[in-house]
């Protein structure tokens, strides 16, 4: 084989891979659009009247996750299953955002942390790497950390809306998250940096709870939490 033939063959490989990446990008753009729609829907809970609409907003968000499933089903057909991590960078950020959105919906519904397995069901993915197109553990953890930041914001807006029990629930939940993450030996630099932000979320929520206590809402808040 001549030198020119070698390079012609290599160009064929490069062109084929570029075609794959372009197909992936198209699907990822659709995923990003759907994620924005879900986020816009859920952001309404931060507004005064939004607290009364939480069940309705969560139900509507779950309908949008049906579209997410369709896009992810399409995405996994665009590349060989064994090359998941070769192209993972293309959808990593939007997938972390979708994990956060799924976790936010579940928290608003039940005030619990969604499991990785439950997220895979919501998104229509596999929980195990051996099965191909799966939810990477680090992507799940990143999404959970985004949730913590969102909940710290929600604790502040809850007080503005007159919901004084919610910040205490959020405080308990975020402190449990912090304890859980302390059990992990995080190697991923990006994940570790994001985890560093969790302590600020914890502090922010604690300040909200403390402010409620100073203002005399502590007994009322505690009683409301016990009732729930």
Swiss-Prot record:
Chain positions found as Phosphoserine: 190
Function field: DNA-binding protein that specifically recognizes consensus sequences at the breakpoint junctions in chromosomal translocations, mostly involving immunoglobulin (Ig)/T-cell receptor gene segments. Seems to recognize single-stranded DNA ends generated by staggered breaks occurring at recombination hot spots.
Check the record and name the InterPro entries matching this protein: Translin, Translin_C, Translin_fam, Translin_N, Translin_sf
Q: Kindly give the PANTHER family that the UniProt entry links to this protein.
A: TRANSLIN AND TRANSLIN ASSOCIATED PROTEIN X
Q: Which Gene3D superfamilies match?
A: Translin, domain 1, Translin, domain 2
Question: Positions modified as N6-acetyllysine?
Answer: 187, 199
Q: What is its main location?
A: cytoplasm
Compartments, record wording: Cytoplasm; Nucleus
Q: Which Pfam families match?
A: Translin (PF01997)
This protein's species is Pongo abelii (Sumatran orangutan)
Broad enzyme group: hydrolase
Which lineage ranks, top first, belong to the organism behind this chain? Eukaryota, Metazoa, Chordata, Craniata, Vertebrata
Q: Which domain of life is it from?
A: Eukaryota
Q: Name one GO molecular function term.
A: RNA binding
Q: What is this protein called?
A: Translin
Stretch list, region DNA/RNA binding:
86-90
